[in-house]
From Swiss-Prot:
Keywords: Cytoplasm, Initiation factor, Protein biosynthesis. Pfam families: IF3_C, IF3_N. One of its GO terms (molecular function) is translation initiation factor activity. It comes from Xylella fastidiosa (strain 9a5c). It comes from the Bacteria. NCBIfam families: infC. Belongs to the IF-3 family. It is found in: Cytoplasm. This is Translation initiation factor IF-3. GO terms for cellular component: cytosol; membrane. The gene is infC. One of its GO terms (biological process) is ribosome disassembly. The keyword Protein biosynthesis applies. Monomer. IF-3 binds to the 30S ribosomal subunit and shifts the equilibrium between 70S ribosomes and their 50S and 30S subunits in favor of the free subunits, thus enhancing the availability of 30S subunits on which protein synthesis initiation begins.
Length: 180
């Protein structure tokens, strides 16, 4: 049970120094030059002599490839690359705004301003126009509201789905126009 703390090698965790349990490793020196296949102890001694760590780079290779480097700096660089990749990917969210056929002008302007902000941030907006009671017999008011929203947003948006009736509400989806 003494070897319970052996770290398994997935892409997120690189083994270093005494965590490496294979007898022979292919070593790359701190200058990037291929040193060759050495025993684990020889490779560790070489790394300690330079005051650096022995880090397992490719555990699936035969024998595993290890590099003599500063492990802290290596982890920092990996974290930096991961953060850059994460920054470049933007998750598109769907924001939802609810209207009524009789929404007052002030409320309408606030919702329109919020909708523009969501679209500028790159999010899609789902517009719900909810009908209550006898309003269902006046669906043209909902269509007029949808047309008004479309006109007020102008050419900044793409209408992904035209207004359609789903139960007691009219639904419409808009997305920001791609800037070229």
């Amino acid at each position: 049970m003494g070897d319970c703390n052996i770290s398994t090698s997935d892409n997120k965790q690189n083994r270093k120094n005494h965590e490496i349990r294979v007898p022979r490793v292919r070593v790359i020196g701190s200058d990037g030059e291929m040193v060759g296949v050495l025993s684990r102890d020889e490779a560790l001694a070489m790394a300690e002599k330079e005051g650096l760590d022995l880090v397992e780079i490719q555990p699936q290779a035969d024998p595993p490839v290890c590099k003599v480097m500063n492990f802290g700096k290596f982890k920092f660089e990996q974290q930096k690359k991961a953060n850059e990749a994460k920054k470049k990917t933007k998750q598109v969210e769907i924001k939802e705004l609810k209207f009524r056929p009789v929404t007052d002008e002030g409320d309408y302007q606030i919702k329109l301003r919020n909708m523009r902000r969501f679209l500028e941030e790159g999010d899609k907006v789902k517009i719900n126009i909810r009908f209550r009671g006898r309003e269902m017999s006046h669906q043209e008011l909902g269509r007029q509201m949808a047309t008004r929203i479309e006109m007020d947003l102008g050419d900044d948006v793409v209408i992904e789905s035209r207004p359609r009736l789903e139960g007691r509400q009219m639904v419409m989806m808009v997305a920001p126009r791609k800037k070229s």
